[in-house]
């Protein structure tokens, strides 16, 4: 097994005071492969920290690759994948609650939990015990922001984060105007409704960062994108649109879903 040496090192490291193992890294770095083999080695269970893999039916574009969760014929238990319908606005607050339910259940069974994913904000919220509360929509604020450009919204968001001393930095906040407006809505709410106590305790974890040569990573990303397109990415998005999921919602999910949707609704060409 390619990761056996690292698995050996982790297994013999001092985990007596560690309640969890966290594996993180950029796209196409191999973190899922490491997590799966480590889980097999330790008889552990994986908790996903991916903001898009929570959605059912969004398989190719999110790179679920659920077949990879089988090692030597044994399926590694995984959690927080395929837990809600596309179009649902799954958020950080809900993830934190869902994570805690999974984590406590796994620990209660005296099994080692492994947190793995590429959504840094989800991982940070769990490890640091962010104090979160559900933020209601603010129709008046949304209306006031509706005509502003993404650049203008980015400036407003940066100012609010400064005022809030916010550490919740997430690049996807400024992927689109819709995301930026929601982020502004959250920061505006937090400015007026500060939470003084954490809603959950921080979790002590062994953190493993997976890295990869930049050129190799770029090659893998390009290869993976071509593979996804060849294996039905466009058809997957078309099916989601035909099922009633709005183009706006799919664009909200970013990355491949954004561009394939833009292609299907005629905003860009296939080559673009």
Predicted regions and their residues:
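Phosphate/pyrophosphate-binding catalytic cores of soluble transferases and nucleic-acid-acting enzymes
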Residues: 1-272
């Amino acid at each position: 097994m390619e990761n056996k040496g690292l698995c050996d090192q982790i297994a013999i490291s001092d985990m007596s005071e560690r309640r969890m193992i966290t594996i993180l890294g950029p796209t196409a770095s191999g973190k899922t492969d490491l997590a799966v083999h480590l889980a097999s080695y330790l008889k552990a269970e994986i908790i996903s920290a991916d903001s898009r893999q929570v959605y059912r039916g969004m398989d190719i574009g999110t790179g679920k690759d659920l077949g990879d969760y089988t090692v030597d014929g044994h399926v590694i238990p995984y959690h927080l994948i395929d837990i809600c319908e596309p179009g649902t606005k799954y958020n950080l607050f809900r993830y934190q609650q869902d994570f805690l339910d999974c984590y406590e259940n796994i620990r209660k069974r005296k099994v080692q939990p492994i947190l793995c994913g590429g959504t840094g904000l989800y991982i940070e919220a769990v490890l640091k015990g962010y104090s979160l509360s559900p933020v209601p929509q603010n129709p008046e604020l949304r209306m006031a922001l509706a005509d502003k450009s993404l650049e203008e919204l980015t400036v407003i968001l940066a100012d609010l984060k400064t005022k809030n001393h916010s550490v919740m930095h997430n690049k996807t906040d400024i992927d689109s105007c819709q995301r930026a407006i929601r982020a502004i809505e959250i920061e505006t709410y937090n400015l007026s409704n500060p939470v003084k106590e954490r809603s959950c305790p921080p979790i002590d974890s062994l953190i493993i960062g997976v890295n990869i040569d930049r050129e190799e990573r770029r090659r893998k990303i390009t290869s993976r994108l071509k593979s996804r397109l060849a294996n039905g990415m466009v058809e997957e998005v078309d099916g989601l649109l035909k099922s009633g999921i709005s183009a706006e919602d799919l664009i909200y999910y970013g990355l491949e879903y954004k561009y394939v949707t833009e292609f299907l609704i005629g905003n860009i060409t296939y080559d673009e």
